[in-house]
């Protein structure tokens, strides 16, 4: 009986040790960046728009928050700190709409995020009012 109890306890201890030593990779935190409003059009608005990155599923949500006639842009830097890694996703659907961009990123990829407002002019960066973007990047990992 003692021998059976010893085997069971030893096995349980080994299993507990093995489980405590395993690590699972996890995504970073959800981040949100806000764009300044166009105060000439919406003097009382707190923000012109926002961009949110959700690492779980790699979703970029771009929401227009002001009835100002401008689009909201989610500016996302994927994997590095240079302009070569920047991507611009536009929500041109108007106030109170959200564009959901489902990205496919490797786990652990560095992400930087800003939000801006602008007026689409045919190119990803054309028409962006860069003065409405936050000065600092919000950062996380995918």
Name each model-derived stretch:
Residues 1-27:
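Secretory targeting and sorting signals
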Residues 26-142:
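Post-signal peptide N-terminal regions of Sec-secreted extracellular proteins
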């Amino acid at each position: 009986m003692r021998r059976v109890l010893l085997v069971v306890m030893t096995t349980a201890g080994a299993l507990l040790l093995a489980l405590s030593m395993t690590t699972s990779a996890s995504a970073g935190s959800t981040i949100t960046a806000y764009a300044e409003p166009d105060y000439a059009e919406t003097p009382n608005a707190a923000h012109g728009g926002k961009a949110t990155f959700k690492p779980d599923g790699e979703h970029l949500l771009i929401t227009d928050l002001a009835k100002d006639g401008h689009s909201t842009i989610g500016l996302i830097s994927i994997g590095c700190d240079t302009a070569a890694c920047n991507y611009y996703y536009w929500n041109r659907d108007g106030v109170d709409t959200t564009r959901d961009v489902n990205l496919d990123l490797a786990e652990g990829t560095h992400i930087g995020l800003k939000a801006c407002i602008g007026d689409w002019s045919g190119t990803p960066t054309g028409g962006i009012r860069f003065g409405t973007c936050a000065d600092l990047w919000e950062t996380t990992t995918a």
